[in-house]
Amino acid sequence: DRVLHNRGEVSRKSKEKVLKVIEELGFRPNLYASLLASQKERLIQCVIPEFQPGEFWKKKKKGLQDAAQLVSRYGIRIETVKYDQYSVESFRNACSKVMDNPPSGVLVAPMYGEETLKFVVRLSEAGVPYMFLDSKIDDDGYLAYFGMPMYQSGYLCADILTGGRDVPEKIYVVRIARDKMGLSDPTAARRAGFMDFMKEHYPDVQIDNVFIDPKDKAAIYTKLDQTVGAEKGKRFVVMFNSRIHLVADYLTDRGIHDCRVVGFDCLEKNIEALRSGTVQALVAQHTDRQAVEAVNSMADYLLMGKSVAKRDNFIQMDILNRYNCDYYL
């Protein structure tokens, strides 16, 4: 006790022995008792997209809820501030809500690059530490990032799609319409990795971008009829976000079977498409664990000033197919 709290006289030899044992055991003070004594509440706000049941961000929210239970004993409260991922104005409003009464720390999913940059500048000016979830922007001030290595995931995806196969002259990349309008492009780094792989290994293959509105099924089918559906022979199709099930539904309804399809994330609808053979592979991640790790790291920083061991905390990329997907969820 005297060594830990610098109370009373301790010989140098004894102090060195105690400090050595502390280091070997990885001991840290009893935070629970200390924080109960301080009675100070801290708030971590998580700025994330709105979601429907079964969607990607539902799993992330589950991780945040699990983490909230773990850190609540230390006087830390977790609050989500949601925005419409298809509305830049909604994102601005969510950021303004945070800045109206700045919290102790912020986790943000940066769907809108320029607006996120403005937001984190304001956070820095207010002295609020922040971390990125799922994707990140070019910025020097973030405390940590928790998510896939985006560029490498795109490179991996291209290898899964093409490796050891006769590749057609054209590959269809299905993208959300917001990319084309320049509003938001959270998978830009993933797409860059994919494109670099193709340039290195299949420079003559044409990449055809197909933009869809995920909220308009009729428009999706019309667009895919004009592109994927109009092609004859073997077709390769890829999507860089969690909505490959939209393509799978189209292929099933149209009775199209000669497609190789690769997507991302283990949503139940995507897993169903894997089981049926409509989608051949998914690059998956345990997104709920990302959220838990991010909250725990922010809590350590707020409570002890403990820096994150790694600034970029890349979660592992798992390759799922119809034979192993049931053992992953």
Model regions and ranges:
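N-terminal helix-turn-helix DNA-binding module of bacterial transcription factors
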Residues: D1-Q39
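Hinge/cleft segment of the Venus flytrap/periplasmic-binding protein
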Residues: L25, M181-G182, M198-H201, H286-L329
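Hinge/beta->alpha junction and helix N-cap segments in small-molecule ligand-binding domains
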Residues: P49-K58, E79-S90, G147-S153, R175-G193, ...
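Central regulatory/effector-binding core of bacterial HTH transcription factors
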Residues: V71-P103, L107-M111
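Hydrophobic alpha-helical
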Residues: G105-E125, D208-N270
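Flexible loop/hinge segments that line or gate small-molecule binding clefts
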Residues: Y112-Q152, L267-R275
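Hydrophobic alpha-helical segments within soluble ligand-binding/sensing domains
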Residues: Y145-Y172, Y221, N270, H286-L303
